[in-house]
Amino acid sequence: MSSKLVLVLNCGSSSLKFAIIDAINGEEYLSGLAECFNLPEARIKWKMDGGKHDAELGAGAAHSEALNFIVNTILSQKPELSAQLVAIGHRIVHGGEKFTQSAIITDDVLQGIKDSVPFAPLHNPAHLIGIEEALKSFPHLADKNVAVFDTAFHQTMPEESYLYALPYKLYKENHIRRYGFHGTSHYFVSREAAKVLNKPVEELNVITCHLGNGGSVTAIRNGECVDTSMGLTPLEGLVMGTRCGDIDPAVIFHLHDALGMDVASINKLLTKESGLQGLTEVTSDCRYVEDNYETKADAKRAMDVYCHRLAKYIGSYSALMEGRLDAVIFTGGIGENAAMVRELSLKKLGLLGFDVDHERNLAARFGKGGNIAKDGTRPALVIPTNEELVIAEDAYRLTA
């Protein structure tokens, strides 16, 4: 076992994903998820040494109890894992304009994460709790905690991409602009694509589609992000599981003025009750939409709107490629597994030279990637993402 092990923590508002990864060879020694925080059914499940395990955390348990369980129950069974830890990597959703790359966590970095709380009110406070608990649980690694920001990869966007057409002082004084998210995933799959296409990263022109319960598309030119679909928050852009993505902002005024909804109710509607959930009025699960596309009107409606929006973004981002698009890339839970989403979306993009091979497309799922396009047509790559590995690599690189 290597002494290059990194504990990777991804703290959500009601969950904590964790893993222990060898930062050099990518081997995963432990992975798990603690969820349903602050509820009676709070629980934790994990994989270690080829076995799957789960346990109750106790009613009302949250981040502190989950980390205590990881340290005192899981790692106590395998003390050599704890002994080999050299760093802790934290996924941070929003780093604002301050962070263009990963950073060792100092008081200044903590303040920067706090300053971005208004733009990520569910995520950043949870990240801060995770950092605080990690410092308590692993005091010997106090100066080896690293923040890896979802927003960092998008900081290469030019002004014409990140500015909204609002009074300029709102940007200068209040930092209201496009930031973008899923940056770690877009970064990882673009680097993997460079290997597949046998091109130097700095010459790579691709459009990456991270499609999960949240989803975003990124235009990458010469290896750098030049535009992305999510905005100030992760609400803008694509149709998502429960988020609406792009809408006319005046819809909000109509909901308030004509339907009498208050701001909190409108926020809940747009973030928790829209997207696939809203269009089907049944579920946010894309598998339902795929399975019932031919037989249920709600599933067809949701899938058609979803793929229309996705194709529109890919098409518009092709205009930013300066005449050369090397490939489109699909990743994330939906991007890696939903063959129908890929096929229906790319079918709309024949003008760009995409032509899907039906059998290759069906075969690319459950961790199996590859080029799903017919020979001689523009590549469409399915590449499983590995955000945890990027976080581990960055944490090790900065602290070694």
UniProtKB/Swiss-Prot annotation:
Active-site residues per Swiss-Prot or TrEMBL entry: D150 (proton donor/acceptor)
Alphabetic keyword roster: ATP-binding, Cytoplasm, Kinase, Magnesium, Metal-binding, Nucleotide-binding, Transferase
Signal sequence residues: none
Xref: CDD domains: ASKHA_NBD_AcK_PK (cd24010)
Cofactor note text: Mg(2+). Can also accept Mn(2+).
Location of this chain's protein in the cell: Cytoplasm
Gene Ontology CC entries for this record: cytosol
Top EC class, one word: transferase
E.C. no: 2.7.2.1
UniProt: ATP binding residues: K17, H210, L211, G212, N213, G214, D285, C286, R287, G333, I334, G335, E336, N337
Organism superkingdom: Bacteria
Binding partners and assembly: Homodimer.
NCBIfam families attached to this UniProt entry: ackA (TIGR00016)
Name recorded for this polypeptide: Acetate kinase
Annotated organism of origin: Pectobacterium carotovorum subsp. carotovorum (strain PC1)
